[in-house]
Amino acid sequence: YYRDDFFRDADPKKMLVFSGWRFVPKAIALLTSHEAEQRIAPRGRLWEGDDRPPLRFTEKGSFHIFDVCLPSPALARLVEPSALASDALTAKELLRRTRKALKRALEEAGVQVAATSRSPIWQVVARLDRHSGSPIRKALEGSAAYNGDDITERFAEHVDTFVDWMEEGGSLRISEERLTHLARIAAFSPAVSILRAFWTTYPDSCGEVHERLVDLCFGELRSYFNRRTVRAIVERSVPAGRGYVRAAIEYCERAHFQAVADEYLYLVKNVLQRNGPAEMAEHLARVLGVGTGSPNIN
């Protein structure tokens, strides 16, 4: 949907291999993925026994996970990359448009943009979601993770805090720097991108958030980005010293995650006949949970 420096002026291309076979492509994919995993930093920090996944909830507060995993309708509405594809924007230009739309939405919600911040970034998003009439609270509180089948013992605590922020009044203030970061989340976060893909694939669900999508984003999607091989790929794609959450979002920007999600959901709906958001979320959960394992060949 936008031009970038990685592919430069090259047109996107696809290569179809063994299109008439059913078993062989899966076998090749399995073996190729296994070989690739063996070559991706088999030694080092990520493979040490005491390594901890970065997207984990702790008692100290872990709202940075929301950057990657919260499908916020208020953020998803700010921009529709597919609708801007004909404008031939760069990723930076798309980010600027998103930032402009976000700043306008913040002003309408009564959030001040200033030189410094005094409000947590997700408290600001909670205000945006409340102001826009977002159904995110119902989706969060209706998710299986929140109601007994908890992905972690801390997830429900974070949801309760977010809901409390939605109910609070008072003034909020966000800095220009955090405004840009939040615009990047709105444009490129995988969870927000998947939510937009659901809306374009199932137009009747536009503006809604299914509870199963919340479970998908905070469950299988979060686990996927916690995988050591995924982390190695993401961390290699950004400058050294970049925090993992920021790196994951920038990777989704470079990898055109929104376009990939839109096309994949379109194909799954129309080829595999996944007829609704709940069924699609279940399918994506299985896809994100697939691992290469240790294949044996007879």
Task: Cite the ranges covered by each PLM segment.
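Helicase motor interdomain insertion/brace
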Residues: 1-298
